[in-house]
Amino acid sequence: MGRSTLHALVSILHLWTTSLDAGQSVRTVFVDFRKAFDLVDHNILLRKLQEKSVPKQLCKWFESFLFQRRQRVRVTGYPHSQWLFLNGGMPQGSLLGPVSFIIHIDDLQPLCDVLKYVDDTTLTEIIGPKSSASAMQCFLEQLLTWSNNNNMQINGSKTKEMILGSASRRDLPALTINDTHLERVSVFKLLGVYVSSDLRWETHIEYIVSKAVSRLYFLKHLKRAGLTQLHLLHFYLSVIRPVLEYASPLWHPTLTKSQSDRLEAVQRRALNIIFCCTSATPYIFTLALADISSLQGRRLDHSRRLFQNICQVDSCLHHLLPLPRDPAVTSRLRKPTKYPRPSIRTAKYCSTLSFALVNFQ
């Protein structure tokens, strides 16, 4: 089945939290490829297509799509530059661009856990007992070798490192790429979501609340321009609410009441603007006027639907679920459920979707 950014985020968060719950530490590097799509070598890409036994005619079609592309530059007041033929790069905005890049980096397999989502690459090393040494520098050398062999470039100044787990592992030696020391961060924006080394979501909630509130400005201007309540509501549902809900099943399980209230406050303000209500108007009343649910209710619904998706054996996240109970055991339970709740050692594991979603059985 398809793999979205949410699937990728859930997968890596599960790896982190289960490792931390087992008493291990996690060292993660967020890799930034310099001009990733622009540096894809056409000849190397075609060779990789052939190595994957792609039909010859399809390879020819790819070759026709990639080769003989040219570009030139024009500055206002000056004539065009000479045409220049390109031997690399993917056309911006094309459907084949992301697919081609995925094929290009498919053979990037360092000896550690790696998350690849188009041009976002994340390396994760699980470090065991306190005496265990980190091998991440070795993994980075492998990555650098691959990059050089494939005419790709790693941007050391934008590649970041994060350590999750015991504070005693913060003294791990610094990492370098091409003599550039990687910055160690406590918060990083991964696939649109701010993740932190303590696996709390305060930074992300602050970010999405601020972003959504800034868009209320446009809602007010549209109202002054005379748009109907229906059109204003459509604007909110399509432009503002998605900001508050992106990847919500990932962070909903450990959301605090205060954080949840801050999210609801944004929706309440938007509805008050649309329906000319005051701050004293009950929230439940404006929800009824708009015929929509609270954000908390929608997050629960999104989580239930994701759980139903994960339960499908062909789901890319199906392996994250605990082993199902024996049917004979299930039949003797007062409240029969297919999947048992995983046992945990720490509160960290409660933030994993596989732990939280078993409640939706």
Model-derived features with residue positions:
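Conserved pre-catalytic core of RNA-dependent polymerases
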Residues: M1-M90
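Catalytic palm subdomain of template-directed nucleic-acid polymerases
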Residues: A36-K52, D106, T121-T145, S166
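Basic, alpha-helical interaction scaffolds
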Residues: L115, T180-L250
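Short, conserved micro-motifs composed of acidic
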Residues: C138, Q153-S186
